[in-house]
């Protein structure tokens, strides 16, 4: 999963007036009744993992929602029940810190648009003309920045199933009957030997004039850096970090760690993109 960072606020007058939505307060006000929301044929519901992290789930099984709302099952029990039968529902994870959030989505989990629908559907207070905004924070790391990286280590290349090379890679591995609708993507990890710099290889891939990948993340140092930092490059340049944990507690801990590690970048992006938000 990828933990993407977003700004949350309400706006009017074409974005000139911006106010905080106090997301943490609003979500916690819903939890006592285990509120869910029907959107079309799907149901959205939210449960708390810890003080800042929430499990946000989409399902089309009304009986599951009723069962969860009547039970005292932990979010771990809920997530495990979804994992046992993937047709029941799909989770995403939400980390809230002030007017910014971390949002990690499984393949079919609810999106940030679903979160917007949920907030509005559950009665978030909006004045006339106001809109809820969940805006991706865009980082400054670009291909040009890579040229100035002092050291590049482990590099992960994402190849989406829609790309022609996806099937070629599976065939090299021995697959013969490839049904495209079954797959989302492949992650190819290029792992160097201990303390070896693979900057040349990483740059060749990044600057490939005919790219056969969608996203790249890499562990790198810039010219002034003394530690390896995770850099995530995509067409949109969305500020984000990969998550590799399994349990809810691990995911919550990792999302908090990602936020703390990238806080300066997050706040800088927020200041540059959004500016001042009124209480």
UniProtKB/Swiss-Prot annotation:
Entry's Pfam families?
A: RexA
Signal peptide span:
none
Q: Which domain of life does the UniProt lineage start with?
A: Viruses
Role according to the record: May confer an overall protective ability to the host cell by triggering a growth arrest and avoiding lethal host gene expression. Additionally, may confer symbiotic protection to the lysogenic host against secondary infection.
Protein name, UniProt field: Protein rexA
Q: Which organism is it from?
A: Escherichia phage lambda
Q: Which gene encodes it?
A: rexA
């Amino acid at each position: 999963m990828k933990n993407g960072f977003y700004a949350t606020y309400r706006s009017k007058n074409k974005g000139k007036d911006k106010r905080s939505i106090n997301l943490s307060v609003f979500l916690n006000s819903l939890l006592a009744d285990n509120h869910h929301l029907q959107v079309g044929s799907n149901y959205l519901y939210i449960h708390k993992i810890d003080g800042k992290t929430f499990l946000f789930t989409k399902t089309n099984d009304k009986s599951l929602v009723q069962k969860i709302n009547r039970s005292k099952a932990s979010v771990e029990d809920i997530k495990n029940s979804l994992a046992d039968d993937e047709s029941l529902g799909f989770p995403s994870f939400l980390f809230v810190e002030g007017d910014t959030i971390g949002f990690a989505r499984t393949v079919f989990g609810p999106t940030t648009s679903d979160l917007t629908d949920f907030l509005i559907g559950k009665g978030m207070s909006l004045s006339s003309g106001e809109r809820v905004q969940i805006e991706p924070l865009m980082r400054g790391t670009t291909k040009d920045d890579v040229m100035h990286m002092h050291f590049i280590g482990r590099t992960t290349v994402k190849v989406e199933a829609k790309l022609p090379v996806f099937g070629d890679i599976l065939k090299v591995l021995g697959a013969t009957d490839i049904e495209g609708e079954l797959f989302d993507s492949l992650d190819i990890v290029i792992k160097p030997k201990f303390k070896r710099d693979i900057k040349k290889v990483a740059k060749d891939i990044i600057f490939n004039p005919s790219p056969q990948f969608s996203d790249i993340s890499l562990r790198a140092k810039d010219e002034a850096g003394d530690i390896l930092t995770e850099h995530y490059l995509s067409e949109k340049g969305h500020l984000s970090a990969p998550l590799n944990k399994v349990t809810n507690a691990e995911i919550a801990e990792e999302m908090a760690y990602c936020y703390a590690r990238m806080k300066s970048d997050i706040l800088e992006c927020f200041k540059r993109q959004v500016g001042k938000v009124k209480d």
